[in-house]
């Protein structure tokens, strides 16, 4: 049979494709036309100058059970041998193929409600299309997203080598349609946010699995997560990832720098010691079914991607913190958080350095600097933390819980060194309290029973400062280990030693190095205060204004009685 078509045109309109058992029409096409058509049946060739699809829409849906609707819909009932198809098939060539003003609805019903994005105004061109493939095909793509955002891409497609090389730019893509993803495991709401990325993508489909390499940048902006009460829980102004390299064949992800601008978080410790993040977690409807006893062994997991981030920089961060598990609820605000972390890596033995600084409440300052193994912090951590000019009155919640007293006045500066090696903690805390006084009593079942006013008076120097050194140690793998408890135990030990041996504390505080301040010695039978003893009460009065000293008398009979007899004998002689 010999038949030819020379420079023909074809046109179809109002195409609708739907399964017999569905009312919805998943595929529509307003018009399809082919111009410059040339067909030669004897040579089995089909040529066209232009193939153009205009208008219409396709719905790509993943059902609740995970099946792709279009794949199921177009699955062939009988698969013909591909080798036979090649023998019998035609060679097809199209100079230019176009898609104009098309739309795609992406729906994922494995989430409830479904995740949905509507791609609109899809315009695409591809040149030099040939089947079987013979050469590379330049292509161009642009589209808008109804929910917000746009995508542009340009590159080449090589069907013979099964490869793609393209550059793309995705801008201002709305993240709020992903709210059902967040709601699957939490009660939180993704209130706002948009994302973007740009760069180059190279795909080599001949490798197994296909190798994908991406170089470029990505960003998230105006992200906000809200609680069920519509309160802001966390978010950020902008997160930018610069100089990204993702290579699936080399199993690596490398980022030169991550810039985080105006991050915010709200952390609340509840009365039962859970956090607000625990409260927002959803309880699974039912536990996952156990695998059958005769199930085949699972395939070994693929090697994880190696992740490296050279630098993370934070600016203008803030956090609201509250602890409701205390006798008096406590809250503070951390502001102007800034700093950086360098050398982050998923390698277990890698160490990262960090340096951060932020304001606490109105006039306080907090700093942290050191190094850590980010994916194994219990193996190695060495962090120095410093607090300066922190008002103590808001800390009454903690003193009320542990000491049964509010704080009337005072400020604190604290230097802490945290060192962890193989889960063993060695901590060193140096604390300076300025003008520190306790206020009214508060009922607390965990309060210590110590004369705290005496301890404070004994510890306060002539300039109104209390200087404490609090070394701590422990095994953080111990389930009963609590760093706060260890520090409080160290403070309690200091206070106990002070009130049970006050003059030893005074001797250490004032430089005598002994307990001699506790004794004022008189010659037996004499009321004259010796010059060597006059310094002791003077020292205490000048350096410890808060103390009231009560002097008691102790008489040593073995020394006094002979002396009194001698004095009496002198008077009668």
Predicted regions and their residues:
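Extended terminal
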Residues: 44, 90, 156, 246-251, ...
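Extracytoplasmic/secreted envelope proteins and their assembly/folding machinery
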Residues: 50, 71, 175, 392, ...
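Secondary-structure transition motifs
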Residues: 1-123, 159, 183-192, 205, ...
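Short beta-strand segments that buttress and anchor functional surface loops
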Residues: 139-146, 155, 353-361, 370
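Buried hydrophobic packing residues in well-ordered domains
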Residues: 10, 32, 51, 99, ...
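Transmembrane beta-barrel strands of outer-membrane/channel proteins
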Residues: 53, 168-170, 218-220, 260, ...
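Short beta-strand micro-motifs enriched in acidic
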Residues: 39-42, 61, 127-132, 156-160, ...
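Transmembrane beta-strands of outer-membrane beta-barrel proteins
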Residues: 6-8, 166, 214-216, 255-256, ...
């Amino acid at each position: 049979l010999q038949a030819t078509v020379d420079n023909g045109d074809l046109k179809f309109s109002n195409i609708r494709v739907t399964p017999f058992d569905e009312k919805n029409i998943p595929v529509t096409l307003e018009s399809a036309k082919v111009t410059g058509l040339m067909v030669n049946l004897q040579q089995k060739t089909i040529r066209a100058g232009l193939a153009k699809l205009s208008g219409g829409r396709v719905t790509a849906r993943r059902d609740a059970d995970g099946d792709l609707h279009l794949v199921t819909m177009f699955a062939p009932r009988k698969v013909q041998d591909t080798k036979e198809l090649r023998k019998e098939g035609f060679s097809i060539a199209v100079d230019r193929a176009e898609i104009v003003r098309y739309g795609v609805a992406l729906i994922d019903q494995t989430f409830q409600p479904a995740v949905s994005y509507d791609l609109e105004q899809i315009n695409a061109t591809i040149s030099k299309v040939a089947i079987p493939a013979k050469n590379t095909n330049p292509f161009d793509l642009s589209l808008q997203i109804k929910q917000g955002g746009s995508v542009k891409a340009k590159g080449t497609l090589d069907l013979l080598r099964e490869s793609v090389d393209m550059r793309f730019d995705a801008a201002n893509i709305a993240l709020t349609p992903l709210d059902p993803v967040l709601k699957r495991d939490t009660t939180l709401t993704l209130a706002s946010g948009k994302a973007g990325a740009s760069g180059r993508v190279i795909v080599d489909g001949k490798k197994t699995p296909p190798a994908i390499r991406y170089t470029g940048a990505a960003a998230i902006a105006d992200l906000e997560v809200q609680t069920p009460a519509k309160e802001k829980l966390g978010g950020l102004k902008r997160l930018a990832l610069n100089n990204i390299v993702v290579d699936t064949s080399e199993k690596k992800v490398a980022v030169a720098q991550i810039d985080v601008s105006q991050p915010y978080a709200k952390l609340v410790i509840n009365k039962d010691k859970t956090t607000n993040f625990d409260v927002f977690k959803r309880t699974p409807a039912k536990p996952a079914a156990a695998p059958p006893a005769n199930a085949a062994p699972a395939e070994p997991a693929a090697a994880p991607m190696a992740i490296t981030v050279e630098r993370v920089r934070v600016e203008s961060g803030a956090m609201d913190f509250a602890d409701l598990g205390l006798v008096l609820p406590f809250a503070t605000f951390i502001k102007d958080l800034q700093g950086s972390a360098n050398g982050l890596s998923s390698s277990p033995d890698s160490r990262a350095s960090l340096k951060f600084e932020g304001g606490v409440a109105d006039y306080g300052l907090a700093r942290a600097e050191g190094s850590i193994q980010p994916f194994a912090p219990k193996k190695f951590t060495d962090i120095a933390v410093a607090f300066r000019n922190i008002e103590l009155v808001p800390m009454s919640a903690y003193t009320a819980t542990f000491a049964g007293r509010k704080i009337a006045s005072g400020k604190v500066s604290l230097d802490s060194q945290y060192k962890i090696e193989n889960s063993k903690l060695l901590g060193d805390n140096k604390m300076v309290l300025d003008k520190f006084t306790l206020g009214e009593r508060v009922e607390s079942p965990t309060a210590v029973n110590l004369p705290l006013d005496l301890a404070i008076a004994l510890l306060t120097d002539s300039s109104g400062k209390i200087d404490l050194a609090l070394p701590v140690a422990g095994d953080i793998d111990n389930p009963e280990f609590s760093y706060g408890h260890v520090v409080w135990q160290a403070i309690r030990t200091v206070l106990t030693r002070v009130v049970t041996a006050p003059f030893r504390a005074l001797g250490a505080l004032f430089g005598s190095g002994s307990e001699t301040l506790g004794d004022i010695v008189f010659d037996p039978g004499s009321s004259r205060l010796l010059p060597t003893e006059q310094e002791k009460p003077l020292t205490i009065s000048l350096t410890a204004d808060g103390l009231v000293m009560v002097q008691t008398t102790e008489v040593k009979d073995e020394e006094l009685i002979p002396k009194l007899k001698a004095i009496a004998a002198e008077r009668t002689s």
